[in-house]
């Protein structure tokens, strides 16, 4: 791994990033420092990109069972610009609004990207949360049936965004569990 050119972030850029994200100045500067350490040699941070492997190997994501989906949802063309990284950190910050967190959670959990969280997606979510490919079929069916019976308001065996949003709004733990401190900031 190389290192980006050590350009100081311009004050105007810092103010703009702070206005456009839910991050504090210190968090932005901490993310900037980490990004500089990871990005290719000789590049200015605004032109540099990180690979999905670099981002998914960060300590906070390395242990997350959804790291590949998180990276896919937040990256552009499978690479991360500094602004992509800021956007991801902003959504997972404590200060991000519930509606934004719900929108991104839905996109992350929609594995087949069909615009719904269907049985295929629910099975993948459960398997990843259990960290097992050998969960019993009965357990998978029980969990999927429970989720759908609680959240599938139109009984079509899948969750639309509005159904998912309704379910997450009722979940007291959602806001606390949909947080990641990426940079040790």
UniProtKB/Swiss-Prot annotation:
Coiled coil: none annotated. Keywords: Calcium, Magnesium, Metal-binding, Repeat. It comes from the Eukaryota. The keyword Magnesium applies. Interacts with ITGA2B (via C-terminus cytoplasmic tail region); the interaction is stabilized/increased in a calcium- and magnesium-dependent manner. PANTHER family: CALCIUM AND INTEGRIN BINDING FAMILY MEMBER 2, CALCIUM AND INTEGRIN-BINDING FAMILY MEMBER 4. This is Calcium and integrin-binding family member 4. It comes from Mus musculus. The gene is Cib4.
